């Protein structure tokens, strides 16, 4: 009788452990994206979320046993949306910064970016003209470059004027319309804009390069572990190379 009960108990424990290890398998997660951040995240012509990060997350979700839904959110409040559980993660070109690390956890980095100034293609403005010549410079609010430029201007006595936008593409449109002289943004979306619009990349402006990572809530340790493992597998796969080539990332 004892042996029989022991076998039953061991069987029950095995089932419980198996269930626990698969507790997250098949779980639906909501990924918050900046829908105006090509080539990493955007809404395509069919009205469907697309981009490098969207396709990467689709692959990782399938690989790690998740179902993922991508939802556009205002970038300036996307960390708040994560903390209040409106979304489960942010895989959408988010820089890993000390300020953000105080609130959320990040995966291992998957892409390194630098910040640049974008101007009209026929512009003769120099970087000094933009930083010291009372020029209007556009920047997406809630970004690390917006914070850096504001602090650097105060520290260095630059007299540029900052105008804040909901997205980098809106700032690019105002460059073309003559409302602002330039816009500061990450180099990948800047290249995307230069390929499609009558603008060019003027160059970097002194801000150090940053790493992109996926953000999750600090308490979601299993999700963080799974995303790190998924990224590791993805970056070792041929599909990673295909995505990099498809979205012309360098």
Predicted regions and their residues:
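A ligand-binding cleft/hinge motif common to bilobed small-molecule-binding domains
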Residues: 77-80, 93-102, 148-151, 174-177, ...
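Extracytoplasmic small-molecule ligand-binding "clamshell" domains
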Residues: 25-93
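Short helix-initiation/N-cap motifs at beta->coil->alpha
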Residues: 54, 69-80, 124-125, 162-177
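Periplasmic-binding protein-like
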Residues: 35, 112-119, 191, 195-232, ...
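Alpha-to-beta junction loops
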Residues: 66-67, 83-92, 134-136, 167, ...
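Extended ligand-binding regions for polar small-molecule ligands
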Residues: 54-63, 122-128, 134-144, 213-250
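Acidic, polar ligand-binding/catalytic clefts
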Residues: 62, 67-131, 200-207
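Ligand-binding cleft/hinge of the Venus flytrap
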Residues: 43, 57-65, 145-164, 194-195, ...
């Amino acid at each position: 009788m004892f042996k029989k009960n022991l076998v039953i108990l061991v069987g029950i424990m095995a089932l419980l452990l198996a269930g626990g290890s698969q507790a997250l398998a098949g779980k639906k997660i909501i990924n918050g994206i900046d829908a105006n951040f090509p080539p990493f995240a955007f809404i395509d012509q069919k009205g469907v979320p697309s981009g490098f990060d969207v396709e990467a997350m689709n692959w990782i979700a399938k690989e790690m046993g998740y179902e993922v839904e991508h939802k556009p959110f205002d970038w300036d409040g996307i960390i708040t949306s994560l903390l209040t559980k409106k979304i489960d993660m942010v895989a959408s070109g988010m820089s890993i910064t000390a300020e953000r690390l105080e609130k959320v956890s990040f995966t291992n980095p998957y892409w390194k970016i630098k910040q640049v100034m974008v101007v009209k293609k026929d512009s003769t403005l120099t970087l000094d003209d933009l930083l010291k010549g009372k020029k209007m410079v556009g920047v997406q609010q809630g970004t690390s470059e917006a914070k850096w430029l504001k602090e650097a201007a105060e520290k260095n006595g630059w007299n540029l004027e900052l105008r804040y936008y909901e997205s980098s593409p809106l700032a690019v449109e105002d460059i073309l319309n003559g409302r602002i002289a330039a816009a500061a943004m990450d180099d990948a979306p800047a290249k995307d804009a230069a390929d499609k619009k009558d603008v060019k990349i003027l160059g970097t402006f002194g801000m150090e390069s940053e790493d992109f990572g996926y953000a999750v809530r600090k308490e979601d340790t299993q999700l963080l572990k799974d995303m790190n493992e998924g990224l590791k597998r993805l970056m070792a796969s041929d599909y990673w190379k295909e995505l990099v080539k498809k979205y012309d990332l360098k």
